[in-house]
């Protein structure tokens, strides 16, 4: 069986229905619906093109509609649209596609199709019973006449997406402009506060740079004149005029020699005062604070208390043993250093030999003591042996009478026995 095309259905005037789970509208309603001439559709299509879709509506939120389709042939048929309205286009397969749910193609090239919703244009107004229970008030009360009117040129789905994307782009552009204005306003305030904070710091920095240049110029002048001068090093926190008097200073060897001479002229470090030393030195960029601190260091370095007398004696002996080396004069050579190292090694070996000889003597003395103790113990043992021998010699002399008595007893007994035997024989 051959399939009937949609063009034949539209030309024959048979009502066309799209499959939908919603109940169908009875055919008797076709008689009550007035027909709209084609002339009225043209200005309405222009209005639909000019009116964009509201941005808050989306394809998925369109509620089910019921309307009528008006064609150029004059036939009017009921048309349903579910949550995803699908119209078939004229193609080889003539099947329903899911790519563009709002895409509808006209039955012929010369005819135009519109979907009119609302009683004011002569269309069919749906009743409350036609809506499904699941569908709620998903749209706003604004008129939606311009939502489903399409032309031949551009598909309806693309038009909707373009209008929605344009509206969303406009909203994003407005939000970005508002955000940029807000950020620019805040950054301007921050920049103004930063400028006001940094402006007061320009003066002290310039003053410190001027002070550094002045000190460098004075140093160059003093070096040309041949007089020693103190090199002042500004501290990192010295940005005010009050800190110029307490700037750090590097004491050169020449300046230290002049300081020592001034202290000696004043009678020593204990009697010298910072003011008197400053007057005698007559150095540039030198304040009383510098002289005072240097004088305290000089006193502590010169009069350092010794820990004990033994340590002082050891230090004196070491100074006498080791020859002095002039490191400042530059006479220190490698050969001299090697010679000193050899001398130290020799002294160490000598000390080790002395310790060994002492140990040997101690061992010999110990052996002598042991021999003496042994000799003292031997005479005592001889006396004990003599006493024991003498005691043993006395004991046999005392035992002699007993033995003689014993001997006498057997002899008497024998004599008696012999006498008895003689008397018995008789």
From Swiss-Prot:
An example Gene Ontology CC term for this record: cytoplasm
Record domain HTH myb-type: where: 243-303
Phenotype of gene-disrupted mutants: Repressed nitrate induction of phosphate (Pi) uptake activity. Reduced biomass under Pi starvation; this phenotype is aggravated by the loss of both RLI1 and PHR2 and is associated with leaf senescence symptoms and lower Pi concentration.
Location(s) in or outside the cell: Nucleus; Cytoplasm
Cystines in this chain: none
Alphabetical list of Pfam families matching this protein: Myb_CC_LHEQLE, Myb_DNA-binding
Major location category of this protein: nucleus
Residue ranges with Low complexity bias: 102-119, 205-225
GO molecular function: DNA binding; DNA-binding transcription factor activity
DNA-binding residue intervals: 274-299
Compositionally biased residues, Polar residues: 69-81, 237-246, 387-401, 411-426
Basic and acidic residues compositional bias, start-end: 303-322
GO biological process, one term: cellular response to phosphate starvation
Key words, A-Z: Cytoplasm, DNA-binding, Nucleus, Transcription, Transcription regulation
Tissue: Expressed in roots, stems, leaves and fruits. Expressed in the root cap and in the exodermis, sclerenchyma and vascular tissues of the root, in the cortex cells and the stele of lateral roots, in the mesophyll cells of the leaf, in pollen, vascular cylinder of the anther and the veins of the lemma, palea and pistils, and in all node I tissues.
Signal peptide start and end residues: none
Region ranges (Disordered): 27-81, 96-123, 198-247, 302-326, 382-426
Induction (free text): Not regulated by Pi starvation.
Function: Transcription factor involved in phosphate starvation signaling. Binds to P1BS, an imperfect palindromic sequence 5'-GNATATNC-3', to promote the expression of inorganic phosphate (Pi) starvation-responsive genes. Functionally redundant with PHR1 and PHR3 in regulating Pi starvation response and Pi homeostasis. Involved in both systematic and local Pi-signaling pathways. Regulates several Pi transporters. Regulates the expression of PT2. Directly up-regulates SPX1 and SPX2 expression, but PHR2 binding to DNA is repressed redundantly by SPX1 and SPX2 in a PI-dependent manner.
Oligomer status and interactors: Interacts (via C-terminus) with SPX4 (via N-terminus) in the presence of inositol polyphosphate. Interacts (via C-terminus) with SPX1 and SPX2 (via SPX domain). Interacts with RLI1 isoform RLI1b in the nucleus.
This protein's name: Protein PHOSPHATE STARVATION RESPONSE 2
Naturally occurring in which organism (per UniProt): Oryza sativa subsp. japonica (Rice)
Taxonomic lineage: Eukaryota, Viridiplantae, Streptophyta, Embryophyta, Tracheophyta
